[in-house]
Amino acid sequence: MSERALRGTRLVVTSYETDRGIDLAPRQAVEYACEKGHRFEMPFSVEAEIPPEWECKVCGAQALLVDGDGPEEKKAKPARTHWDMLMERRTREELEEVLEERLAVLRSGAMNIAVHPRDSRKSA
């Protein structure tokens, strides 16, 4: 198998066509700068939406757009609690009814609940 493999990978990668007569898409160079002072340019299409931040090519930190608005602050949603999810499914009146039903079952002794779970086991 190794004898039949092509020996030059450049044959596949290199295009021998010329760029003459080909109109490239219009581009714009956008400059970014990171906290460490690295500045670099990225080419974007004229029609593309320019991202406000980009990963620095040198150090990998977040670089911000030079002469541009900073990234938009995302509004953080308040965390949904168990109570919030419960209130989405039931009204307060329904919860009161369920509570009364469960308390009535407990008071009637219909549920066999051991005070200490260890007491309900058989001793050896």
Curated annotation (Swiss-Prot):
Effect of residue 56 to A: Colonies remain small
Cofactor annotation remark: Bind 1 Zn(2+) per subunit.
Binding positions for Zn(2+) per the UniProt entry: 34, 38, 56, 59
Renumbered residue ranges of the record's region Sufficient for interaction with HrdB (SigA): 73-124
Highest taxon of the lineage: Bacteria
Cofactor (UniProt): Zn(2+)
UniProt induction comment: Constitutively expressed partially under control of SigR; both SigR-dependent and independent induction are further induced by the thiol-oxidant diamide (disulfide stress). Induced by Rif.
Pfam families per record: RbpA
Phenotype when changing residue 88 to A: Increased binding to HrdB (SigA), restores wild-type size colonies
Alphabetically ordered keywords of this record: Antibiotic resistance, Metal-binding, Transcription, Transcription regulation, Zinc
Gene Ontology process terms (BP): positive regulation of DNA-templated transcription; response to antibiotic
UniProt key word Transcription regulation: yes
Gene disruption phenotype: Grows slowly, colonies are smaller. Not more diamide sensitive than wild-type, sporulation normal, 15-fold more sensitive to Rif.
Keyword DNA damage annotated: no
GO molecular function: bacterial-type RNA polymerase core enzyme binding; bacterial-type RNA polymerase holo enzyme binding; zinc ion binding
InterPro entries, per the entry: RbpA_sf, RNApol-bd_RbpA
Record's function text: Binds to RNA polymerase (RNAP), stimulating transcription from principal, but not alternative sigma factor promoters. Stimulates transcription from several principal sigma factor HrdB (SigA)-dependent promoters but not from a SigR-dependent promoter. Stimulation occurs in the presence of the transcription initiation inhibitor rifampicin (Rif).
Quaternary structure and interacting proteins, as annotated: Homodimer. Forms a complex with the RNAP, and a complex with RNAP plus principal sigma factor HrdB associated with promoter. Binds to free principal sigma factors HrdB and HrdA, probably via the sigma-2 domain, but not to 6 other sigma factors tested.
Family of this protein: Belongs to the RNA polymerase-binding protein RbpA family.
Protein name (Swiss-Prot/TrEMBL): RNA polymerase-binding protein RbpA
Taxon lineage: Bacteria, Bacillati, Actinomycetota, Actinomycetes, Kitasatosporales
